[in-house]
A protein has these predicted regions:
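P-loop NTP-binding site
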Residues: 180-289
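Canonical P-loop GTPase G-domain recognition
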Residues: 108-110, 117-180
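Catalytic P-loop NTPase motifs of RecA-like helicase/translocase cores
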Residues: 33, 57-58, 91-92, 119-120, ...
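Solvent-exposed alpha-helical segments within well-ordered globular domains of core cellular machineries
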Residues: 16, 35, 39, 66, ...
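Conserved glycine(s) of the Walker
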Residues: 10, 151, 242
Length: 289
């Protein structure tokens, strides 16, 4: 089941809500998700494999943007069900591009209208859903609020009805196929995105240099790459306060995910123009499509 949509419609929040635990990072900033991320939900006789995808966007100014779009579009292939996520039914330019790809897909389709809790006048909800149903007459519509866990049972029921029968691919306890190294790098990036202004988060990437278990703790060394010296200064903050705060917040989340004490060391380095350098982004782990 691929979850697709433009940036910032709540795809990662929806995945986390459906799984009942957080595996995909979130922030209020668009393009937080950079990789396809598999989430596995097993309940009784059902196992659903969800794929959270980067937001599809028309503007591709850098190699990183092209990678993200390529990742998202690759998820449209070989899936049984496609969830097209819309923010309160609004369809803008980027949504039109997703709609075009959605219509071309041979998968079973569901339109998920998210953030219904933010609709102030609830009387507008039914007319909006009716207009969408006219535009997509053969597609099932499900209004939800991923943030408030509203109507997710109905969405899961619709998904299960659309999925074919097949054996389980993963153990019932498994929630993702991503490594712990990947998950901890994403946790650091989430904390940075939440701490920093609008532009800087997009110039940041994380590389885990060391991931060792010893003395009843996991020891992690992480390098945070930025593109300019000025960005490095902003990220570190006055007397290192911002970086220290990011490290503390990240460590708490890591301990929750890993279930052990974490010793985290972080460094900030400049890698000029990495986000528009195909070779650099591959070396930094953006090479899975």
């Amino acid at each position: 089941v691929a979850i697709v949509g433009r940036p910032n419609v709540g795809k990662s929040t929806l995945l986390n809500a459906l799984l009942g635990q957080k595996i995909s990072i979130t922030s209020r900033k668009p393009q937080t998700t950079r990789h396809n991320l598999l989430g596995i939900k097993t309940t009784g006789s059902h196992q659903i494999l969800f794929v959270d995808t980067p937001g599809i966007h028309l503007s591709e100014p850098k190699a990183l943007n092209r990678y993200m779009n390529k990742s998202a579009k690759s998820a449209l292939r070989d899936v049984d069900v496609l969830l097209f996520l819309l923010d309160r039914g609004k369809i803008g330019e980027d949504d039109q591009e997703v709609s075009r790809l959605f219509n071309q897909s041979k998968a079973k389709k569901v339109i998920v209208v998210n953030k219904i809790d933010l609709i102030e006048n609830k009387n507008t909800l039914f007319p909006m859903l009716s207009r969408l149903q006219e535009k997509y007459p053969d597609v099932k519509l499900v209004p939800v609020s991923a943030e408030k866990n509203a109507n997710l049972e109905e969405l899961e029921k619709v998904i299960c009805e659309a999925l074919p029968e097949s054996p389980f691919y993963f153990d019932a306890e498994q929630v993702t196929d991503r490594s712990e190294r990947f998950l901890v790098s994403e946790i650091i990036r989430e904390k940075l995105m939440r701490q920093l202004g609008d532009e800087l988060p997009y110039a940041i990437t994380i590389q885990i240099e060391k991931f060792e278990e010893r003395d009843k703790a996991t020891h992690i060394d992480a390098t945070i790459f930025v593109e300019k010296d000025g960005q490095k200064s902003i990220l570190i903050g006055k007397s290192g306060e911002r970086l220290k705060r990011v490290g503390t917040d990240a460590r708490k989340d890591m301990e929750q995910v890993l279930g052990v004490k974490v010793m985290l060391n972080t460094w900030v380095k400049v890698k000029s123009g990495w986000s528009d350098d195909e070779r650099a982004i591959r070396s930094l782990g953006y090479d899975d499509v």
